[in-house]
């Protein structure tokens, strides 16, 4: 019985290590609306959805939006910009821009609806706002760690700015999507098997 119990422990440990070695990409999603804007909600019927996927050091940003009251900023004299991810703050307040400024490269400008996708290397300074790097030790690694921690803690938000709402027309807090529960189910099964072994041993081998 000890050998079987030991084998179960070994299998569990191997599964855990395999999970670390072959970690699934981290996925975060946000539903964007004017009501989510802070400190003042925006009176906008606009809606949007954003997905941020982090696979190793590569981040993929995908977003779609529609129904904005005003067009996304196109670098007009107002100084507003189209879209960013801000870090690090809860949904009740605001934070500085973490991602490239003045906006995500290639984000649709001068429109009330659109879609976007792009990839960023989180080990490059060009993937961040210089001010965010300076605020986190002055290094790209410091910015990377702070940004990832913000994502995983639910302290980042996706914000789309328009000419009518330079502070942001629609916003959504990025929330982590739970990872597959494979290891949890495996762990539950192993625990159940171990309990059955112990019970059988106490019963003297009787079923």
Language model segments and positions:
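Bacterial N-terminal signal peptides
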Residues: 8-16
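Sec/Tat signal peptide C-region and signal peptidase I cleavage site
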Residues: 19-23
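Bacterial N-terminal signal peptides that target proteins for export
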Residues: 1-8
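C-terminal membrane-anchoring or membrane-association module
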Residues: 194-207
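A short, hydrophobic C-terminal helix/tail in secreted or cell-surface proteins
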Residues: 179-197
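N-terminal leader/targeting pre-sequences
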Residues: 24-176
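Intrinsically disordered, low-complexity repeat segments enriched in small/polar residues
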Residues: 5, 185, 202-203
